[in-house]
């Protein structure tokens, strides 16, 4: 993707300096400041407002700097004006996330679940799990709505950063600078900022281009991380020395130089500045070599590397007086920032830009493991055991054959739609964390049981791109394991401590099995249902699990005023959309790599597109004959499937399915709006989920 042709002068102004460097950094690096800094400030302020609304008070400063400029304004001067607000929102969130999270946030994008579900590990000070998910969902949804292709790059980078930093040992020791720099590049999130910059410029790099520029950009990342250490050291050192601090080490190059060379902090700072200068010069040289060599004709990469270079002086300039590193400036900075936001457009039009001096600064300027504290493999019954008083030397049978199939299906990758759906409903219903965990475990347990049984009943050899459970363990063991897991799900419902929840469970399980019985009957008897019959089957079978978790959550909701909001129409629509979407994607190339090429045709199932085609095509059509043959022979070959697909397209059945999905999506969004008005609460988590499911 080539960036939209905006010149640097369209987006930013050069900032004059009295010397070629800024406090000994970024020699001969020009500095620019974005013309639309008011939008950057608005984006950050919106994030802070959302944080206070959904989570609670904010204790630390973020991106703002009324003297040298907002972080995004000076670090990303080439950013498109229409994208700087959302990027600043992301920066602000990242700063606040860094403030409160010790290892990994209690909720963040799940690395294993295709960006749909949200993890829950550990918070340090964040009050609201749901609130964090709300902010993340709103942020991701905005990125995806602006530029879905570039947004996916940002999301992947965020996931990689979170997954990597979670695994980083913050207490580790470093023996040399190179080892520390490799650690710090990831720890500071420099690659993530890089992808946000590309998003802002509408630049998309191919994997080959990423590999080509990797050695060029590394010294830039290193310079950014070390400069961050230099300017943040004073406040980190002060916190480190507090009596209540339990830290044994600091993740800061200044501190490491003090330890390595037994020097005081001023000498250590000087040495950090010196090695930072080396990386700055190395980046300039590598860019020059690339532009004069193999990148001579690659204008996209030249622009990208030039823009990346502006991060170095921008980061230094912002660090000079940002209240984040100089907390005594917070009060004055807040007053100036409020005033500047009111007058920002006038300031931009008049070209008012403060000069940065090289002088010193003054203050003026397992399947169910998460559901219970009890052992996952022991009974939770409080009744006396029949085993009590038995001989102690009796042979004890293990659970490996009982749980093996269940643990296998649970180990396969999942998109986590149901877990994300629970997170979304909890925005409105606000259940205690322990009940949310139990309901998620119930949903996962039931879903895994249904997958094991469905694959046997449908004769499916694959599940999520891997061998189906029964092809490994055999049908008998798989059925036995699935039956046990269903009982385990009922046992988990008891942990909700509400007899009505058990009634709800039985009601919806009954609906689910009734729906499944019709699906199996139609396939076995070669009886094509009407569209109305099929949709009712979906409502009971696929919608049953969605409806079960919704009803359980409403029963346990802490906000009594929201216990009676009309969620059932929305939940039924979600179930219907999810199944028809699955039918559609099973017949598209995108889905075939996971579940097998058009596997529904092998199974002879009457999916939504086939039902529509049956209404239009004659009784003796190739589709009916081929489906009958597939049921008898155990499947169709590729050419037969391609013929069926061709007929489905020719008959307009695929187009009709797409139209139906669009209509359902419109109804879902309308229902979301209605529930938001009824509850008085926006649901960004659900909006993001719906956006990710949209075909």
Swiss-Prot record:
Enzyme Commission identifier(s):
4.2.3.-, 2.5.1.29
Q: What residues bind dimethylallyl diphosphate, as annotated?
A: 463, 541-542, 579, 586, 595, 605
What this protein needs as a cofactor is: Mg(2+)
- Span of the annotated motif DDXXD 2: 454-458
Annotated Mg(2+) 2 binding sites = 98
Q: Where does substrate bind?
A: 98, 184-187, 228, 232-236, 324-325
Q: In which pathway does it act?
A: Secondary metabolite biosynthesis; terpenoid biosynthesis
Q: Name one GO molecular function term.
A: lyase activity
Please give the Pfam families that the UniProt record associates with this protein: polyprenyl_synt (PF00348), Terpene_syn_C_2 (PF19086)
User: InterPro entries this protein is in?
Assistant: Isoprenoid_synthase_dom_sf, Polyprenyl_synt, Polyprenyl_synt_CS
Q: Which UniProt keywords apply?
A: Isoprene biosynthesis, Lyase, Magnesium, Metal-binding, Multifunctional enzyme, Repeat, Transferase
Where, by residue number, does Mg(2+) 4 bind?
Answer: 454, 458
User: Among the record's GO biological process terms, what is one?
Assistant: terpenoid biosynthetic process
Entry similarity comment: In the N-terminal section; belongs to the terpene synthase family. In the C-terminal section; belongs to the FPP/GGPP synthase family.
The name on file for this protein is: Variediene synthase
> What organism, scientifically named, is this protein from?
Aspergillus brasiliensis (strain CBS 101740 / IMI 381727 / IBT 21946)
Q: Which gene encodes it?
A: AbVS
């Amino acid at each position: 993707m080539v960036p939209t042709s905006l010149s640097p002068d369209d987006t930013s102004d050069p900032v004059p300096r009295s010397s070629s460097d800024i406090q000994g950094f970024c020699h001969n690096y020009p500095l620019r400041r974005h013309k639309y800094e008011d939008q950057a400030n608005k984006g950050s302020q919106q994030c802070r407002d959302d944080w206070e609304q959904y989570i609670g008070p904010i204790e630390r400063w973020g991106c703002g700097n009324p003297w040298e400029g907002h972080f995004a304004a000076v670090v990303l001067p080439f950013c498109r004006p229409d994208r700087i607000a959302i990027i600043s929102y992301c920066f602000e969130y990242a700063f606040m996330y860094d403030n409160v999270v010790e290892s990994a946030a209690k909720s963040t994008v799940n690395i294993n679940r295709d960006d749909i579900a949200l993890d829950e590990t550990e918070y340090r000070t964040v009050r609201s799990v749901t609130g964090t998910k709300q902010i993340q969902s709103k942020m991701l949804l905005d990125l995806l709505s602006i530029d879905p292709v570039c947004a996916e790059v940002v999301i992947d980078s965020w996931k990689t950063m979170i997954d990597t930093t979670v695994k980083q040992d913050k207490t580790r020791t470093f023996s040399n600078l190179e080892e520390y720099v490799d650690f710090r590049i990831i720890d500071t999130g420099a690659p993530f900022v890089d992808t946000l910059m590309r998003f802002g410029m509408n630049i998309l790099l191919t994997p080959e281009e990423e590999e080509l520029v990797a050695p060029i950009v590394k010294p830039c990342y290193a310079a950014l991380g070390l400069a961050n250490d230099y300017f943040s050291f004073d406040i980190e050192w002060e916190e480190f020395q507090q009596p209540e601090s339990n830290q044994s080490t600091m993740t800061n190059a200044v501190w490491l130089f003090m330890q390595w060379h037994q020097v005081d902090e001023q000498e250590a700072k000087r040495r950090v500045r010196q090695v930072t200068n080396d990386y700055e010069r190395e980046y300039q040289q590598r860019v020059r070599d690339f532009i004069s060599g193999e990148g001579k004709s690659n204008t996209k990469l030249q622009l990208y590397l030039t823009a990346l270079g502006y991060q170095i002086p921008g980061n230094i300039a912002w660090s000079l007086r940002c209240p984040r590193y100089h907390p005594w400036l917070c009060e004055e900075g807040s007053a100036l920032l409020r005033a500047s936001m009111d007058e920002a457009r006038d300031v931009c039009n008049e070209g008012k830009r403060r000069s940065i001096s090289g002088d010193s600064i003054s203050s003026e300027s397992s399947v169910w493991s998460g559901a219970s504290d009890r052992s996952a493999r022991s009974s939770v019954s409080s009744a006396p055991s029949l085993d009590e008083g038995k001989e102690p030397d009796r042979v004890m049978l293990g659970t490996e054959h009982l749980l093996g199939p269940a643990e296998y299906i649970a180990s396969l990758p999942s998109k986590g739609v149901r877990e994300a759906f629970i997170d979304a409903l909890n925005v409105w219903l606000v259940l205690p964390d322990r009940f949310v965990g139990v309901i998620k475990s119930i949903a996962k347990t039931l879903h895994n049981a249904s997958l094991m049984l469905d694959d046997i009943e449908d004769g499916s050899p694959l599940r999520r791109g891997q061998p189906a459970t029964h092809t490994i363990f055999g049908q008998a063991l798989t059925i036995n394991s699935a039956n046990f897991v269903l009982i385990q799900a009922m046992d988990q419902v008891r942990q909700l401590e509400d007899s009505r929840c058990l009634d709800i469970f039985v009601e919806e399980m009954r609906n689910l099995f009734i729906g499944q019985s019709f699906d199996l009957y139609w396939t076995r008897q070669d009886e094509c249902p009407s569209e109305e019959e099929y949709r009712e089957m979906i409502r009971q079978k696929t919608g049953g699990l969605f409806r079960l978790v919704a009803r359980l959550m409403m029963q346990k909701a802490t906000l009594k005023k929201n216990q009676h909001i009309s969620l059932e129409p929305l939940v039924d629509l979600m179930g219907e959309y999810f199944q028809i979407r699955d039918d559609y994607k099973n017949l598209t190339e995108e889905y075939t790599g996971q579940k097998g090429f058009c596997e529904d045709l092998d199974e002879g199932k009457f999916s939504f597109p086939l039902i529509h085609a049956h209404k239009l095509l004659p009784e003796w059509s190739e589709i009916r004959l081929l489906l009958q043959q597939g049921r008898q022979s155990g499947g169709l070959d590729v050419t037969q499937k391609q013929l069926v697909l061709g007929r489905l397209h020719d008959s307009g059945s695929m187009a009709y399915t797409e139209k139906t999905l669009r209509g359902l999506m419109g109804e879902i969004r309308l229902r979301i709006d209605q529930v938001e008005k009824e509850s008085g609460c926006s649901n960004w988590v659900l909006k993001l989920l719906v956006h990710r499911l949209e075909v």
